[in-house]
C-alpha cells in the first residue's frame, strides 16, 4: 500500500499541475484573442486605406448568412471575385485589388463563410464544398451579375475548381493559385510520399480543440509563423499585414470555423468525386518553392481542361500574390485580356 501511495501522490500532483497549466494556457489564449478582436473595426478601416483605391466594406446576404465583403471598381465593369485561402481573409488580395480596378474591373473580395467578419455557422457539415460554392454563386447574383471572373488561392482555389465544375454558368474565366486540381491531388497523395509528408497538417486539423488552441494562444505569433515560414521573401508581410491576419484569426469562433473546411473535406469526398472537365479558359499559377504543395501537382492536367495555361513563379513560396505581386498581377491581367 505504501508503494502505491508513494506513486499516486506525485502522480496526482503532476496531473493537477498539468491540468492547472493547461487551463491557464487556454484562458491566456482566449484573452489574447479577445484583446485583438476588440479593435477590428478600426483595423478594417486602416486596412482599406492600404489599398490606395476607393473601396468599401459591406455585408452581403447569401444563403441565410452575411459575408463581409470588400467592393471596389466601376459599377459597370466586368465582375472579378477573389477568394482567399486558409488562414487568410479578404486582405490577402490587397496587392491585386488596385491593379484590377485600374484595368476596369468591378472587384469583389469576400471573407468566405467562417472567416474574419463573415458569419460562422456551427457544424462541420456547413463547410462542405457544395455550400461554399453556393455562397459564391449567390454572391455573384446578388450583385446583379450572371457570371464573373473567379480568382482563388489555396482553399479559395479549391472552391474555384468546384465552382467551375458544378456551376460553370457563373464562371467566365478561372484563375487558380497554388491549389491543386482535385484529381492531381488525389493522385499525388496515393503515389508520392513526399506530398503525403507535406500534407501532414491536414490530418492534424482533424483533431478537436488542439489546433484551435495551438493557433489561437498567440494569434500574432501564429500569423508570423504561418505567413513568413513559407515565404522566400521575408519582407512580403509587414508587421501591419500580420496584425490584420492575426486579428482575423482572433475573431470569435473563427478558428473552429476555418478548420472545419478541412474537417468537412475529410468527412465527405465531394472534392474528389464527380470530377468534370473544365471548359472555361483557365490559368493555374504555381509558386515553385511552395513548402506544402509540390510542383508535381501541376503535371498531367491536360485531359481535364479545354483551355489550360500553367505559369510557374520561381523563388516564391505559397503566399504568391503577396510575395510576387508584380509578376502575379502582370500574368493575371495578361490572361484576362486574352480572347
Predicted features along the sequence, with ranges:
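Short hydrophobic "strand-cap" motifs at the C-terminus of beta-strands
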Residues: 83, 313-316
Amino acid at each position: 500500500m505504501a508503494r502505491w501511495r508513494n506513486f499516486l501522490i506525485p502522480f496526482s500532483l503532476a496531473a493537477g499541475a498539468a491540468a492547472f497549466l493547461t487551463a491557464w494556457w487556454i484562458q491566456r489564449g482566449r484573452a489574447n484573442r479577445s484583446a485583438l478582436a476588440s479593435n477590428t473595426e478600426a483595423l478594417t478601416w486602416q486596412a482599406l486605406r492600404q489599398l490606395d483605391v476607393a473601396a468599401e466594406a459591406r455585408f452581403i446576404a447569401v444563403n441565410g448568412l452575411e459575408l463581409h465583403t470588400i467592393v471596389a471598381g466601376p459599377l459597370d465593369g466586368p465582375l472579378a471575385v477573389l477568394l482567399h485561402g486558409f488562414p487568410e481573409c479578404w486582405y490577402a488580395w490587397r496587392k491585386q485589388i488596385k491593379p484590377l480596378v485600374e484595368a476596369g474591373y468591378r472587384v469583389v473580395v469576400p471573407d468566405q463563410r467562417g472567416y474574419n467578419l463573415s458569419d460562422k455557422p456551427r457544424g462541420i457539415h456547413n463547410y462542405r464544398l457544395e455550400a461554399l460554392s453556393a455562397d459564391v454563386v449567390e454572391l455573384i447574383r446578388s450583385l446583379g451579375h450572371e457570371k464573373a471572373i473567379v480568382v482563388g488561392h489555396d482553399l479559395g482555389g479549391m472552391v474555384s475548381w468546384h465552382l467551375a465544375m458544378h456551376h460553370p454558368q457563373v464562371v467566365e474565366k478561372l484563375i487558380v493559385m497554388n491549389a491543386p486540381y482535385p484529381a492531381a491531388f488525389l493522385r499525388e497523395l496515393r503515389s508520392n510520399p513526399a506530398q503525403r509528408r507535406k500534407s501532414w497538417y491536414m490530418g492534424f486539423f482533424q483533431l478537436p480543440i488542439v489546433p484551435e488552441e495551438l493557433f489561437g494562444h498567440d494569434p500574432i505569433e501564429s500569423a508570423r509563423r504561418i505567413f513568413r515560414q513559407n515565404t522566400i521573401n521575408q519582407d512580403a508581410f509587414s508587421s501591419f499585414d500580420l496584425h490584420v491576419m492575426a486579428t482575423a484569426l482572433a475573431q470569435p469562433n473563427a478558428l473552429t470555423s476555418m478548420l472545419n473546411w478541412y474537417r468537412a473535406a475529410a468527412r465527405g469526398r465531394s472534392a474528389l468525386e464527380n470530377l468534370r472537365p473544365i471548359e472555361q479558359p483557365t490559368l493555374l499559377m504555381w509558386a515553385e518553392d511552395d513548402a506544402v504543395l509540390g510542383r508535381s501537382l501541376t503535371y498531367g492536367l491536360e485531359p481535364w481542361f479545354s483551355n489550360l495555361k500553367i505559369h510557374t513563379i520561381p523563388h516564391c513560396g505559397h503566399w504568391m500574390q503577396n510575395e510576387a505581386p508584380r509578376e502575379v498581377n502582370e500574368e493575371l491581367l495578361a490572361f484576362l485580356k486574352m480572347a
